[in-house]
């Protein structure tokens, strides 16, 4: 089903990847952010026969994301019967074991890309990589439990010129930069299960369109959180957004 907002189109459960139609069930990573919340809303709205099994990675080093995910889930489940119970999994971004794994992952040449003539890692920092690795393991667990794809709300970065003009290009994850879309696919088979990222070819302007067109700005949107910085990252405004990180800047640009 093709859905268009802010002049960007997402083909949700497209025929190429879902030749028999929308799946009977889907696992969904509900992060507490506005992207995954909007994806859950769209699936629940347009595919009421598809069961949505949400989960959240409960970070012991930053619980506010899970608090937001619980609030988002309560709102969505109150509106849609196909939203099932939220499953929580404990992770810790600062876990020494996972930090060591993250350092090795970031040092691996296969996880580096060329940006402005310099090799850089796919992740912005080691803590971000640590959480990504732990969440990957949980996605695999959920995929096997429900024998279906795991949907995420990951979108691509704003245009390069926008990020540079607004001063947040250097804090963005390079793996999400817009560019050669021919090398991307909404299905990722790399880790023995399928991660489904229908927003991968669109940026957060599409997401803002979902909230605006469905009148979610005053109820669902305030329940979400995008800021990734806690006290450990120097956010003096915590638990309020720092106003400096990539996520704060991206959200401000998309919803202006």
PLM regions and their residue ranges:
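Nucleotide-activated chemistry modules centered on ATP-dependent adenylation/adenylyltransferase
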Residues: 1-256
């Amino acid at each position: 089903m093709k859905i268009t907002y802010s002049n960007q189109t997402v083909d949700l459960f497209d025929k190429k990847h879902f030749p028999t139609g929308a799946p009977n069930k889907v696992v969904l990573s509900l992060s507490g952010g506005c992207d995954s919340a909007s994806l859950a809303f769209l699936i629940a709205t347009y595919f009421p026969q598809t069961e949505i099994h949400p989960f959240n990675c409960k970070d012991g080093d930053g619980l506010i994301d899970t608090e937001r995910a619980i609030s988002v889930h309560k709102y969505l489940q109150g509106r849609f019967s196909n939203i099932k119970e939220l499953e929580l999994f404990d992770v810790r971004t600062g876990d020494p074991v996972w930090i060591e794994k993250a350092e090795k992952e970031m040092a691996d040449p296969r996880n580096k890309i060329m940006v402005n003539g310099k090799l850089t890692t796919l992740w912005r920092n080691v803590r971000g990589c640590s959480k990504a690795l732990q969440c990957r393991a949980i996605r695999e667990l959920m995929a096997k439990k429900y024998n279906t794809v795991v949907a995420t709300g990951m979108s691509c970065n704003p245009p390069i010129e926008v990020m540079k003009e607004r001063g947040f290009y250097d804090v963005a994850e390079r793996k999400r930069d817009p560019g050669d879309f021919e090398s991307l696919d909404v299905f990722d088979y790399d880790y023995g299960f399928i991660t489904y990222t229908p927003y991968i070819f669109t940026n957060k302007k599409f997401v803002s369109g979902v909230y605006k067109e469905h009148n979610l700005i005053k109820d669902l949107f305030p329940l979400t959180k995008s800021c990734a910085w806690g006290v450990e990252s120097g956010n003096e405004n915590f638990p309020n957004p720092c106003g400096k990180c990539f996520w704060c800047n991206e959200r401000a640009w998309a919803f202006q």
